[in-house]
From Swiss-Prot:
EC number(s) reported in the record: 7.4.2.8
Pfam short name (any one): SecA_DEAD
Cofactor remark from the record: May bind 1 zinc ion per subunit.
Protein name as annotated: Protein translocase subunit SecA
Record-level Gene Ontology MF annotations: ATP binding; metal ion binding; protein-exporting ATPase activity
Membrane topology, record value: Peripheral membrane protein
Tagged with keyword Transcription regulation: no
CDD domains on file: DEXDc_SecA (cd17928), SF2_C_secA (cd18803)
Gene3D superfamilies: 3.10.450.50, Helical scaffold and wing domains of SecA, P-loop containing nucleotide triphosphate hydrolases, SecA, preprotein cross-linking domain
Length: 896
């Protein structure tokens, strides 16, 4: 109450920020007459002039007014569009490293040209991030006219681009691309072996379009580059057979949190079932040796209790296909991670595809936090302002609309059943169409879209346009024409995002569709005039009918997604309306107290087909949504804390890797590693201050033979009178260094330097891959520590640190052992295969297997399966001596 009074007296914080921008906007406007009088050549020449001012020590803020005035004039000349004052404000907010909330139709794409041009003058490159390839390509082609007029280069990253094309696009002043492509390029770059093969430059500034979709909705989506792991389909099938034997008391399911865990009784029961099936090693289910069995039992439970066929996934052509929860589309080629997809395949009795092992991964949260400067645009961000600030340090500023918004939002209508709800929606649509009012209906899935469309065809004779396109170009055309009088478009709520619905239709879309490719300039002009007149006529009809009417078929967990649907109408001061039709069967209503609401409706004597409509209902629903939003925020925040642990380790590994790639001579690093390994081996068998009779001389001799390939008289050394452990260390060091010096003399220093660098990078990659797998397994079971009154996050931090230290120790030993036991042949190196990437539940195709180190083979001795150092030279296509049944090049030959 007091907050509301204070806001009326002093204005909100947002109002104060907007007011503070007015002075700068006035200064830009004052420059307009000056730039208007310039010739095209003189206007373009302002770019080198502004760059020279930066070179002389001025800051971006010093040249901002001149830069914004220049872009505005260039847009007028190339696009025929002049930035409004509110668009200048949006540009200022973006340049300030904040999120600009701008309503649909306010021209966010044009707004971005202002800060993009200004920041591109530094020469460090600006990334403009969109949600799909179509929008990246469209925006790049559209806005490139402005940038190129002013002498800047523009690139676009799309899926089909090869490394050469990507490198060229990233080298441009302005680069458009999707969040997935940019993230995968970062991961792939950190798997390359030569600096010149990397495609990205150091990060400088990114503007994220639809920032809420990318940084909130997809925040938990890790980008993963994977390789194929061992086939464990038989284990998934065996565990799946146990699931029907569980009873509801064996697990606790939280529908709100979409999670399921075994109860104490359930843990005992599944342990007993696994032991009966011969799937459990000795000890209990939660011991380290049984981590694989626990993993499969957990994923099997999730598959059977949390995931419903035709809701979360569908079965098609002997495959389990994910259904996108935001768009309702089938997501071909994507797979749930952590073995969940295999558990679903076992449940449905389809072919089980091999699991993929993570080679590299990063979440969008951590990827975008690497940019020194970050900003974003969207029509809906204020409801998540706290999360943007807490996670990314981004303030949200609501930009005023250019014209007052006159859309009428009606109160929700709540029906008892979904059948009554859909009948009421069909009736409302028929009424709108009768008066020529265009209607957009938002649903949560393709199935619901098709159900409503069929209902309308059979009961009202209305033939709606159902939007379930798999191609963004087609989707964009349908959504762009949804403002034609009498049009009825049914779409999943997120479909077509990024494309405006203009009353009367979209001129550019119609020109692209109706103008022949070989049209002459005269034919083009005539067609444009004809279409423009037709669109204006239809716009007048749509306006007279009340503008676009938006209908929501149910509330989402997030108010933001509801607001996105509403925001489709009422653009640029146009009239419009919106209403939501709900039923007690809807997910949100069912999860949050529909029983209480049902009994209340019965007491009110609500007849079939009648709805309850009251502002109180809206408020109650908003409170429920706020609870879900807060819970989801806490989940994302908690996951980020865990991911930050891995992120710190990832940064260390990637920085070390880059340092190795920059350095041509890593002999000093290798020598340091070798010395540490020697000291570790000696100290392990000859502890400090131990008496000679306590020394494990035989063990030391065996380890020296294993690691360095040297048969030294260590037992004799240890029996000498007065020998000290330091002397043993000195003798061992001397003999090892002599062996390595002889190897260098035999092959030459240049060859050894190349081999050292190649081996070090490759072994580091292999061990990082193994470490990621260990971290995944640790993460899956860590929440159970809470039962022992221990904090899972602290446990994860300490254990993952120990695992990281172990990885580094193992790395030193493996590099040292490989270099000490290799013999070289001078074959040309084969090109490494390209890894493939995917997002989150996305594990499309197997990726890389590691690729052997060029020209390296162990010395030939008698082969023992468990001792690779005894295998000698193994042909790449020969079966691996370890007994795996795989070819050597796909097994130990892939690891160096």
């Amino acid at each position: 109450m007091f907050g509301a009074i204070a806001r009326r007296l002093f204005g909100s914080a947002n109002d104060r920020i907007v007011k503070s921008l007015v002075k700068t906007v006035a200064a830009i406007n004052a420059k307009e007459s000056e730039v208007q009088g310039l010739s095209d050549a003189d206007l373009a020449a302002r770019t080198p002039w502004l760059k020279s001012r930066l070179a002389e020590g001025e800051t971006l803020d010093d040249i901002l007014v001149d830069a914004f005035a220049t872009v505005r004039e260039a847009a007028k000349r190339t696009l025929g569009q002049r930035h409004y004052d509110v668009q200048l404000m949006g540009g200022l907010v973006l340049h300030g490293g904040k999120i600009a909330e701008m309503r649909t139709g306010e021209g966010k794409t044009l707004v971005a040209t202002l800060p993009v041009y200004l920041n591109a003058l530094t020469g460090k490159g600006v990334h403009v991030v969109t949600v799909n390839d179509y929008l990246a390509k469209r925006d790049a082609e559209w806005m490139a006219k402005v940038y190129r007029f002013l002498g800047l280069t523009v690139g676009v990253i799309i899926h089909e681009l090869d490394d050469g094309g990507r490198r060229a696009a990233y080298a441009c002043d302005v680069t458009y691309g999707t969040n997935n492509e940019l993230g995968f390029d970062f991961l792939r770059d950190n798997m390359k072996y030569r600096l010149e093969d990397m495609v990205q430059r150091p990060f400088a500034y990114a503007i994220v379009d639809e920032v809420d979709s990318i940084l909130i909705d997809e925040a938990r989506t890790p980008l993963i580059i994977s390789g194929q792991a061992e086939d464990s389909s038989a284990l998934y099938q065996a565990v799946d057979k146990l699931m029907p034997r569980l009873v509801p008391a064996d697990y606790e399911k939280d529908e709100k949190a979409r999670s399921v865990t075994y109860t104490e009784e359930g843990s005992d029961h599944i342990e007993e079932l696994l032991r009966e099936a011969g799937l459990l090693a000795e000890g209990n289910l939660y011991e380290t040796r049984n981590v694989t069995a626990l993993h499969h039992a957990t994923q099997g439970l999730r598959a059977h209790t949390l995931f419903e066929r035709d809701v979360h996934y569908m079965v098609r052509d002997d495959k389990v296909v994910i259904i996108d929860e935001f768009t309702g589309r089938a997501m071909e080629g994507r797979r749930f991670s952590d073995g969940l997809h295999q558990a679903l395949e076992a449940k449905e009795g389809v072919s089980i595809q091999p699991e993929n092992q993570t080679l590299a991964s990063i979440t969008f949260q951590n990827y975008f936090r690497m940019y020194p400067k970050l900003s974003g645009m969207t029509g809906t961000a204020l409801t998540e302002a706290n999360e943007f600030m807490e996670i990314y340090g981004l303030a949200v500023v609501e930009i005023p609309t250019n014209r007052p918004m006159i859309r009428k939002d009606k109160d929700d209508e709540v029906y008892r059943t979904s059948r009554e709800k859909y009948e009421a929606i069909a009736k409302q649509i028929a009424e709108c169409q009768k008066r020529g009012q265009p209607v957009l209906v938002g649903t949560t899935s393709i199935e619901k879209s098709e159900y409503l469309a069929e209902l309308m065809r059979t009961t009202t004779k209305v033939k709606p346009q159902v939007l379930n396109a798999r191609y963004h170009e087609q989707e964009a055309f349908i959504i762009a024409q949804a403002g034609v009088p009498g049009a009825v478009t049914i779409a999943t709520n997120m479909a077509g995002r990024g494309t405006d619905i203009q009353l009367g239709g979209n001129l550019d879309m119609r020109m692209a569709r109706e103008l022949p490719a070989d049209a002459t300039p005269e034919q083009r002009a005539a067609k444009e005039a004809e279409l423009r007149a037709d669109i204006e006529k239809k716009k007048a009809q749509a306006l007279a009918a009340g503008g676009l009417y938006v209908i929501g078929t149910e509330r989402h967990e997030s108010r933001r997604i509801d607001n996105q649907l509403r925001g489709r109408t009422g653009r640029q001061g146009d009239p419009g309306g919106s209403s939501f039709y709900l039923s007690l069967d809807d997910d949100l209503m069912r999860i949050f107290g529909s029983e209480r609401m049902d009994s209340m409706l019965r007491k009110l004597g609500l007849e079939e087909g009648e709805a309850i409509v009251h502002p109180w209902v809206n408020k109650a629903l908003e409170k429920a949504q706020q609870k879900v939003e807060a819970r989801n925020f806490d989940t994302r925040k908690n996951l980020l804390k865990f991911d930050d642990v891995m992120n710190d380790q990832r940064k260390v590994v990637y920085e070390q890797r880059r340092d190795l790639m920059v350095t041509t001579d890593v002999s000093e690093t290798v020598a340091d590693m070798r010395q540490e390994v020697i000291e570790d081996i000696v100290h392990a068998h000859i502890p400090p201050k131990a008496m000679p009779e306590e020394w494990d001389s035989a063990g030391l001799a065996e380890d020296v033979r294993r690691v360095f390939g040297l048969d030294l008289p260590i037992i004799d050394w240890a029996s000498e009178d007065g020998i000290a452990n330091e002397e043993i260390l000195e003798r061992l060091t001397k003999d090892v260094e002599a062996k390595m010096a002889a190897k260098e003399a035999e092959y030459g220093a240049d060859v050894m330097r190349m081999v050292e660098k190649s081996l070090l990078l490759q072994i580091l990659d292999g061990m990082w891959k193994e470490h990621l797998l260990h971290l995944e397994h640790l993460r899956q079971g860590i929440s159970l520590r809470a039962f022992g009154q221990r904090d899972p996050l602290n446990e994860y931090k300490s254990e993952s640190f120990e695992m990281f230290q172990t990885m580094l120790s193992d790395l030193r030993e493996r590099v040292t052992m490989t270099l000490a036991n290799v013999q070289l042949r001078m074959d040309p190196p084969p090109p490494p295969p390209e890894p493939q990437g995917f997002a989150e539940h996305v594990e499309p195709e197997p990726a890389i297997g590691g690729g052997g180190v060029p020209g390296v083979a162990p010395a030939a001795t008698d082969r023992e399966a468990g001792h690779p150092e005894t295998w000698g030279k193994v042909a790449r296509n020969e079966l691996c001596p370890c007994g795996s049944g795989k070819k050597y090049k796909h097994c130990h030959g892939a690891m160096g």
